[in-house]
């Protein structure tokens, strides 16, 4: 812990600080050059609440625009790979794998993304972006039938690897 100079107020402990904000309060990209390259994985999930008619179509003949789940799966994979282009302070990473699982529940399309890398920082944002882009694509694919579809519950479920170790929501 750094001892503050006279007249300065000590800041919060490092684990209580926002890493993307510098001492002056300006946004910055965190320097990860000193971190070890390790295997890292993140899983994120989300749901798109849809009408009973959309559920019926997805389980049967499909929606008018085409294969909604296959299109959303590919969009989610593309989203994970483009995360640093969308999230300003995200590091470009060597994403080594992205898996998207989409399933039709009684009232929603459920989305689960798993992203893997061997790099200096985690892939939580890539997993969240994969879920978000897949969910947006589901909305685009079903909007002709259900203009009231809702994206909800987008969240990280677990992460492994890195200095902070493993974490799981459960």
UniProtKB/Swiss-Prot annotation:
Pfam families: MoaC. GO terms for molecular function: cyclic pyranopterin monophosphate synthase activity. It catalyses: (8S)-3',8-cyclo-7,8-dihydroguanosine 5'-triphosphate = cyclic pyranopterin phosphate + diphosphate. One of its GO terms (biological process) is Mo-molybdopterin cofactor biosynthetic process. The active site is at 140. It comes from the Bacteria. Substrate binds at residues 89-91, 125-126. Gene3D superfamilies: Molybdopterin cofactor biosynthesis C (MoaC) domain (3.30.70.640). The keyword Magnesium does not apply. SUPFAM superfamilies: Molybdenum cofactor biosynthesis protein C, MoaC. Pathway: Cofactor biosynthesis; molybdopterin biosynthesis. Belongs to the MoaC family. NCBIfam families: moaC, PRK09364.1. This is Cyclic pyranopterin monophosphate synthase. The gene is moaC.
């Amino acid at each position: 812990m750094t001892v503050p100079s006279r007249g300065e107020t000590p800041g919060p402990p490092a684990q209580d600080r926002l890493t993307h904000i510098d001492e002056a309060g300006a946004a910055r990209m965190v320097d990860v050059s000193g971190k070890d390259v390790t295997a890292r994985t993140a899983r994120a999930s989300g749901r798109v609440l849809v009408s009973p008619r959309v559920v019926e179509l997805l389980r049967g003949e499909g929606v008018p625009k085409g294969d909604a789940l296959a299109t959303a799966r590919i969009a989610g994979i593309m989203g994970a790979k483009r995360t640093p282009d969308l999230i300003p302070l995200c590091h470009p990473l060597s994403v080594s794998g992205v898996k998207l699982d989409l399933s039709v529940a009684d009232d929603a399309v459920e989305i689960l993304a798993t992203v893997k890398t061997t790099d200096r920082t985690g892939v939580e944002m890539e997993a969240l972006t994969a879920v978000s882009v897949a969910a947006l694509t589901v909305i685009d694919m079903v909007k002709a039938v259900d203009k009231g579809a809702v994206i909800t519950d987008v969240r990280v479920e677990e992460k492994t690897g890195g200095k902070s170790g493993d974490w799981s929501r459960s």
